[in-house]
Regions:
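Class I (Rossmann-like) S-adenosyl-L-methionine-dependent methyltransferase catalytic domain
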Residues: 1-53, 58-109, 131, 149-248
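Local beta-strand N-terminus motif with an aromatic residue
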Residues: 49, 114-115
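A short, conserved alpha-helix within the catalytic core of class I
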Residues: 127-139
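Short, charge-rich binding segments
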Residues: 110-111, 142
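Conserved helix-to-beta-strand junction in the class I
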Residues: 139-146
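Short catalytic micro-motifs in class I SAM-dependent methyltransferases
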Residues: 122-126
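A conserved beta-strand element that flanks and buttresses the S-adenosyl-L-methionine
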Residues: 119
Length: 248
């Protein structure tokens, strides 16, 4: 475990407050589809109708990407997030308001029906413990129909020299300003647009941890793809793509 429950709870609250207060400016910088989504889509066979789950859907740009990429498929979305302001203005796609990080910390993940595709992008790095990250994978597996696909992204921002330097600086400053203790290895506090006192908690994934996450589902899901994509370097996220076999 990278953080005790008290620290984990505080980090979750920090992120909830960040997105609540910075939703407008954050969403304005989040319009383009991720390059890594294209590779995922290349391997999908969604047919005429597909149920899609998106955990921590943000401003619904993945939903818009799928609609453009699969115009002949009737897509039925189950989108979940705990920041309604991020999806404000989006039409035709209802979003369920749920604090998923808090639910995973308490071991109370939501009951979900089975989907043809289940994803969670830009969220895994906001989960403060390895156990919670495993729980997210288990939740996605349970919410995927046999033969269906589920995928996650793991942010590897410390592999980018510029991002790493900023993360080191903002983390030191944030720990001092917030009086935080208990951060684990590869845990950072990231600033936002040089705004004073504004931080969000993010975890950097090294390849060993990503491999351990993939191994956690051995026997319950088949890892069908693992690759790096996104950002200026094309390597900012590591993706794990699974095919649901059975539940264990």
């Amino acid at each position: 475990m990278t953080a005790d429950n008290q620290t984990a709870r505080r980090l979750i609250e920090l992120n909830t407050e960040f997105y609540r207060l910075q939703a407008a400016s954050f969403s304005q910088t989040r319009h383009s589809a991720w390059a890594g989504w294209e590779r995922l889509a290349d391997g999908l066979s969604l047919g005429n109708h597909a149920k899609v789950l998106d955990l921590a859907c943000g401003n619904l740009r993945f939903e818009r990407f799928l609609q453009e990429r699969f115009p002949r498929t009737r897509l039925e979305f189950d989108a979940i997030d705990n920041c309604p302001a991020l999806s404000a203005g989006a039409e035709g796609i209802p979003v369920r308001d749920l604090d998923l990080a808090q639910a995973l910390l308490e071991g109370q993940g939501p009951e979900l029906s089975e989907h043809d595709l289940a994803v969670s992008f830009g969220f895994m790095h906001h989960l403060p413990t390895f156990e919670m990250r495993c729980a997210l994978l288990e939740l996605l597996a349970r919410a995927t129909a046999p033969g269906g696909v589920f995928a996650v992204s793991c942010w590897q921002f410390m592999d980018d020299e510029g991002l790493a330097a900023k993360a080191e600086q903002t983390t030191a400053r944030g720990i001092s300003e917030l009086g935080l203790t208990g951060l684990g290895p590869r845990d950072y506090l990231i600033g936002w647009q040089t705004r004073p006192g504004v931080y969000r908690y993010c975890h950097h994934f090294d390849d060993a941890e990503v491999d351990a996450l993939a191994a956690h589902l051995a026997g319950r899901a088949q890892l069908v793809d693992s690759y790096r994509a996104d950002g200026r370097t094309g390597r900012l996220n590591r993706y794990l793509v699974f095919k649901r076999t059975r539940l264990g």
